[in-house]
Amino acid sequence: MSDNTRRRRTVARHGQLRSPGAVSQLLRLLAISMAVVLVSGIGVAAYFYLDFSNTVSANAVDLDGQEDLPPDIGAYKGGFNLVLTGVDTCEDDYKQYFGDRCTGGDAEGTLNDVNLLVHVSEEPRRITVVSFPRDLMIPIPSCEDEDGNATAAMSKQPLNVAYTDGGLNCVVRTISSLTDQEVQFAASVTFGGVIEITNAIGGVDVCLANPIRDRYTGLDMSAGTHTVKGLEALQFLRTRHGVGDGSDLGRIGNQQQYMSSLARKLISGEVLGNVPVMLKLANTGIQNLETSTSLADPMMIVQIALAVKSVPFEDIVFVQYPTL
């Protein structure tokens, strides 16, 4: 890790994104959307499994001498935890849009700027998503970096250095130690990953009361309803100079509208009722998510799917970890 990266641990300087708070808000919303993607994606797995199982069972034929059959796959027993992190990294397809952040000495650094602990309870199933501030000063345990070298434990460092020191596993170890919760599953996503998922479902609809013309992001949109994806989606999420009084409040309003629209579309019949779209979404998720080995097991995915398939969207609650 470079000295520059260490110096910027608590500040993500994203080009024209001049406020670190705005970047943190953006990444948090992106990670929250990915929590929805994971839950919805698991729902997709449940849909395929149950549809396949019901179809095969309806046409099955009993054979003599086969009383002892393998047990059915059941839902994951008990509650479980999943860590989801949004990482701030300079991806080749998007780095040209982030100015100094991705052209200077900080370009090689990767920080876990968004950190979520997703808890799925025992029956009755409920989902609680706890958000941890990136600059939360806490102990960081000793971890192994990508070269297999052990990093020294630190008594008080911002949470967002954990990924740099030891990747996804170090983030999990840090959050597990902080909360005294065992974590069974984990995944990370980049900014570009969320954009690719938006593309996979054909974009999301946003409605503008007034036109937006922002020379900083290059966004030029008329008033009314638009379906945004790709670069335009990225511009829409970043713009603030062309919205309202140019403050971060306008940007946050855009982001909330975008993420709400994304979440609604993910759980709508337009996605969950469309097999080709679901397959494309699943494939895009595989390509854009870094997961723990426990999430690489198809049977485990089915078990998780069966555990959460009936949780209504209103029973997914988001809270922030308290800071002193």
Segments from the language model and where they lie:
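Non-catalytic, solvent-exposed segments at the cell envelope interface
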Residues: 2-324
